[in-house]
Amino acid sequence: MHEGVQVSSKLEQLQALLAPVVEGLGYQCWGIEYVSQGKHSVLRIYIDKEGGILVDDCEAVSRQASAILDVEDPISSEYTLEVSSPGMDRPLFTLEQFASHAGEQVKIKLRSPFEGRRNFQGLLRGVEEQDVVVQVDNQEFLLPIDSIDKANIIPSFD
């Protein structure tokens, strides 16, 4: 449990540091992931804008983010910085993002089991207060947003 708190506060610190940089360049900061992988970690910044994201957009954000990260130095270990668009299988981070993608198929992984399971794949019904509502087969689950480790849209190619 304690590790999750550290990761969460690290994410909050990175979000507070990097979101203004991204938004100052004219992009939406869709979300930030910090994945600790032993000695080497990955910091991912997802950016978006009307009309989509190009490689040049990612490079511009990467340059500015690198500069602020070098000065502020919030990550003491080695890490790789990745900047990308959310893509078709976009990750979902906020209640607003979950609400705006209601009606789509999602894959959700929880930090710890809920009703005996950690993985849910089904129809995103929306949000209720601080819960994400997902329908798996004919059963609805209300998953607290704070318990979600990772959530992605499952692209439809119909």
Curated annotation (Swiss-Prot):
Gene Ontology CC annotation, any one: cytosol
Species this protein is from: Pseudomonas putida (strain ATCC 47054 / DSM 6125 / CFBP 8728 / NCIMB 11950 / KT2440)
Family: Belongs to the RimP family.
Name of the protein in question: Ribosome maturation factor RimP
GO biological process: ribosomal small subunit assembly; translation
Designated gene of the protein: rimP
Function of the protein: Required for maturation of 30S ribosomal subunits.
The keyword Manganese belongs to this UniProt entry's keyword annotation: no
Key words, A-Z: Cytoplasm, Ribosome biogenesis
